[in-house]
Amino acid sequence: MTLEHSPPGRSTGPAPPVQRRRDADLPQIDLPTAPQPAPAFERQFFACLAAQGRVRLVLDEGDSLAGRVEGVDDDGAPLWSQDLAEVAAAIPCFTAGTSIMTAAGPVPVEDLRPGDRIITRDAGAQPLLWSGQRDFCWRALGLLPMLRPVRVSPGVLGPGLPARDMLLSPNHLLLAERPATADSPAEEMFLPARDLLGQPGIDVAPLTEVRYLHLLLDRHHAILSEGCWSESLRPDPAAMVGLTEASRSALAGAGFGMDPAPSCRAIAGPRAA
């Protein structure tokens, strides 16, 4: 596997131990037991992609999620087609300024470089293989406000969780714990940030522009962002749709994004498919 990247970064010493405080480091949330319908913002997101060219959205009915996404050439001829429900996971990523825990300590996500060792929940420190980004300007956010990130205020997920305002793309997955019941034990699960909207201290950030950043490790991992466990990039075909053409080409050349990529935890919501 080869990816073009900058020289390895600052992580050289041994990784700090990862604390597994199951009763304290995960938000306790009553998670749904089955995948939930994808909300309308995903349909409108793909309309935004279509407006930028090379991807076209075809809806069966006006406001319905039924439809497909088509890749097109410069003349508008279709090259491929995929059911809209299958690509509902597009753009799961961090925003610039988010602090990511590495073996050398917390680092802003935009300052991470391939070779930096990222602290993971299950496998200690793992090297960053690739990072990418996608920008949305005021025009895109004005026409499609559902592209704006979800803002999680300090402490709303538990003591010190997150440590400060954390902004994530709506589909970015956060690790939570379903409390034990009489019929089942406690279970760690991912859920999209947008599913937390409406809870106190969680809203849509009123930004006029945003830069989304992606972090690729050897596989899908739970990593620490602002003290909360959330996901690294899961490079499956659905997520690849949300990347820039240059990013898709770079990852495809290294063998990523062509086949389904397993999640490191069960997922509550549309991305469970």
Regions found by a protein language model. Name each.
Residues 78-108:
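Long, positively charged leader/targeting segments at protein N-termini
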Residues 2-90, 205-273:
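Sequence-level preference for short, compositionally simple segments enriched
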